[in-house]
A protein has these predicted regions:
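Residue-level signature of outer-membrane beta-barrel architecture
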Residues: 54-58, 91-93, 126-128, 170-172, ...
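Short glycine/proline- and aromatic-enriched beta-strand/turn motifs that initiate or cap beta-hairpins
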Residues: 20-64
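Transmembrane beta-barrel strands of outer-membrane/channel proteins
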Residues: 31-37, 65-71, 102-106, 122, ...
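Membrane-embedded beta-strands of outer-membrane beta-barrel proteins
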Residues: 50-52, 85-89, 122, 166-168, ...
Length: 243
């Protein structure tokens, strides 16, 4: 966690300092709070999913930072207590369809039995579609992972590995009102064929104002090493602002 925070601070300082002497800088902030509640005579359950994102963009570089927290209970038992922080940057050279990226993230997850996990690495990406109302992007790269997991609920598992990280990102805006957006990952260990991670984040938003939307979101995570997965489907509000 300390490594991610330190990397955030260094890159943010470098990015904002260079902005004083180069092209204009644009900022974007987004916050989404979604959840679900179920109450019956036989039991109660609730889930709250909070996501915060911040983006700084220039002509030849973008910096993204984000954090999420998911908490859920069923009756008196905790089902989710999951947090994640991430930072990535993109560097564009010449043809903007192709760019290079770097990533660092840290997460903990009660539902996936992750005590601590750090990932860091980089790669390349290509924009197959890049328009004001539609984006389709595929990226691939290598990540180093250091993890502290819990196998079968009782067995500690501290290890590290290198992963190939493949991501497909899309965004489709219909009539400036409806927004379909998603990031979907497959991360396979290079040395262990049965060690893989699947992460899917997809949402449908309907704009009420330029800055406010109603959002339905679907999140799926699978960690094959711990044999755990979760599926979250919830709804709520998204607030966003460009400046």
């Amino acid at each position: 966690m300390k490594r991610v925070v330190l990397l955030w601070m260094v890159l943010l300082y470098a990015f904002t300092s260079s902005a004083q002497f180069s092209d204009s800088v644009h900022y974007y902030v987004k916050y989404a709070s979604t959840g679900s509640v179920n109450r019956t005579n036989d039991g109660n359950s609730f889930l709250l999913n909070n996501n915060l994102g911040f983006k700084i963009s220039k002509k030849k570089m973008t910096l993204n930072m984000g954090a999420s927290y998911v908490y859920g209970k069923q009756d008196h038992s905790i089902t989710n207590n999951d947090m994640s922080t991430a930072m990535d940057f993109n560097i564009y050279r010449g043809e903007k369809k192709v760019y290079f990226w770097g990533l660092a993230n840290y997460d903990k997850s009660y539902s996936l039995k992750i005590n601590n996990r750090f990932q860091g690495g980089g790669g390349a990406a290509y924009d197959f579609i890049k328009r004001s109302n539609a984006t389709l992007n595929v990226s691939d790269g290598i990540l180093f992972e250091n993890s502290d997991l819990m196998l079968h609920d009782t067995i500690p598992d501290v290890y590290h590995t290198f992963r190939n990280s493949l991501r497909v990102y899309y965004k489709w805006v219909i009539k400036d009102i409806i927004v379909l957006e998603g990031s979907n990952y497959v991360q396979n260990s290079i040395t262990h064929g049965n060690d893989y991670i699947i992460k899917c984040n997809n949402s449908l938003s309907v704009k009420l104002r330029s800055w406010l939307s109603i959002t339905a979101a679907m999140t799926y995570n699978k960690l094959n090493r711990t044999d755990r997965e979760n599926l979250l489907m919830n709804y709520g509000l998204t607030v966003e602002k460009f400046f």
